[in-house]
A protein has these predicted regions:
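Short beta-strand elements
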Residues: 7-20, 31, 389-392, 427-440
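Active-site region of glycoside hydrolase catalytic domains
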Residues: 2-4, 71, 116-232, 285
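Aromatic sugar-binding surface patches on proteins
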Residues: 395-404
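Short, aromatic- and glycine-rich surface loops/edge beta-strands on solvent-exposed regions
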Residues: 1-6, 413-424
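Substrate-binding clefts and catalytic carboxylate motifs of secreted carbohydrate-active enzymes
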Residues: 132, 162, 192-386, 390-396
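Extracellular Ig-like/FN3 beta-sandwich strand-entry sites
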Residues: 350, 367, 411-417
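Short, surface-exposed loop/turn segments at beta-strand-coil junctions that are enriched for proline
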Residues: 404-412
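Active-site-adjacent substrate/metal-binding segments within catalytic domains
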Residues: 4-101, 105-141, 232-272
Length: 440
């Protein structure tokens, strides 16, 4: 008490931890290297509609999917979301709400600096806070007179935020400082040979796009615009024609239901293979990966695992299979290596693949059983198989086996499935599959 009056006080929770990035772009949480299996998140287009009754079920589902980090990009959420992440132990990568093209004049820099200082003051004591970005994508392409955001605005914002938080990493913007987006078949060509990509340590957007279920689609596209698609209407609600038919090369099909299924199947396979591809590069050099997005922010054609009404896209089940702490997967030895595309091998060749065993746990797991088999989908004949026991080393990504299957004339035109499983006693740690086709 001071002169009979109680002093002003502020109560807040805080956490003491250390999250640092080394020179190779790897993350260390309390001196332990951590592989970040992340998720981009936006609760709603209108933040006022969101609250704990929405966030908590979302985050509990994420934790069951083994997601350990969230990236809030291009906006801020209400304080309660960050408090919930504090309690649940979800690591937060917060991006200042700047995206694409803004002015780089002195007035803009001054006002943005005040705002980023406020953002830092609001969030820096949250236990969940791990890292910052001052801008989502500061370098805009296809503009004849683009502003100098990266070399002028971003550096001022970084220095301003560092006055509030001198400890955590402050990142200048995507496509810089070891940070990149890959959206195969959505924002980039689905025929990209990913072996030619230079992959940095932090992939803060990966994913694809598909059309939500018919029940959801009917809530925002008028019935008379549904089929055949009225493309102007569909593009207004998020379907980009060139991305769908030129990048993803999705087939329209003979009905609206077929079109929806074709887009959802492509997204599911593309995202699954993007995850496998990035996890096979664990610490070589990939250290973090964030799917774009958890859910659609409004009724739209989007990139979420869930649509606006939290109805799952097909990709939801596919992602659950490959975001597990332990992962077994096959990497076909094929060139060019295209994610989301059917893998074609020819008669007279051998189907060859590396079998990966990935363990994100901090403990080794001894005496696990790894099994794989290749089955002819046309005849159900098992073409080859193997099983053996091994120790999964802590926090590792290894190739303990290879598949080599000569392809004879009898397999011409056949589709084959590769089934893989890692188990410990009666517990299945990872179960996965992939497909390839044999052509003449």
């Amino acid at each position: 008490l001071v002169l009979g009056w109680q002093e002003d006080t502020v109560k807040c929770r805080f956490g003491i931890k250390e999250i640092v990035q080394d020179d190779a772009g790897q993350w260390y949480l309390n001196n332990k290297r951590i592989f970040v299996r992340g998720m981009r998140y936006i609760s709603r287009r209108w933040m006022s509609e969101a609250g704990e009754e929405m966030w908590k079920p979302d985050f509990e589902k994420m934790i069951r999917m083994n997601i350990n980090s969230i990236r809030i990009g291009s906006h801020m959420e209400k304080d309660g979301l960050y408090s919930l992440c504090d309690e649940l132990g979800l690591l937060m990568w917060q991006v200042f709400p700047l995206h694409y093209c803004v002015s780089d004049d002195d007035d803009m820099i001054s006002r943005a600096s005040d705002m980023i200082r406020d953002m830092g003051m609001m969030l820096t004591n949250h236990a969940c806070m791990g890292m910052w970005s001052v801008y989502k994508e500061p370098e805009i392409y296809q503009l004849p007179d683009k502003p100098n955001n990266y070399f002028r605005l971003c550096h001022v914002l970084k220095e301003t935020l560092k006055t509030v938080d001198p400890v955590r990493w402050v990142h200048l913007g995507d496509y810089r400082e070891g940070v990149m987006n890959i959206m195969i078949g959505c924002c980039s060509d689905g025929d990209t040979d990913v072996d030619d990509l230079i992959i940095p340590p932090n992939i803060v957007e990966f994913g694809s796009q598909s059309i939500p279920c018919l029940e959801t689609l009917r809530t925002f596209i008028p019935e008379d615009k549904l089929w055949p698609p009225h493309w102007d209407t569909w593009e207004y609600w998020g379907l980009f024609y060139s991305n769908t038919f030129e990048f993803a090369k999705v087939e329209l099909g003979n009905s609206l239901e077929e079109f929806i299924e074709n887009t959802q199947e492509y997204e599911a396979v593309s995202v699954k293979e993007q995850i496998e591809f990035l996890r096979m590069k664990k610490y070589d050099p990939v250290s973090s990966m964030y799917l774009y997005y958890w859910s659609d922010a409004c009724p739209m054609i989007g990139s979420g695992l869930l649509d606006y009404y939290r109805r799952p896209y097909k990709v939801y089940d596919y992602m659950q299979k490959v975001y597990t702490p332990v992962l077994v997967c096959a990497q076909p030895c094929i060139h060019p290596y295209k994610l989301g595309r059917e893998k074609i091998f020819h008669v007279g060749m051998s189907y060859t693949a590396r079998v990966w065993a990935i363990n994100d746990n901090y403990e080794s797991i001894s005496d696990v059983l790894l099994q794989w088999k290749v089955t002819d989908c046309e005849t159900d004949e098992i073409l080859c198989r193997n099983s053996f026991r091994l120790e999964l080393l802590a926090d590792s990504a290894e190739i303990p086996d290879h598949i080599v299957l000569p392809l004879g004339e009898e397999l011409s035109g056949h589709r084959c499935r590769v089934d893989m499983k890692i188990s410990s006693g009666n517990e299945v740690l990872s179960e996965n599959d992939s497909y390839f086709r044999v052509e003449p």
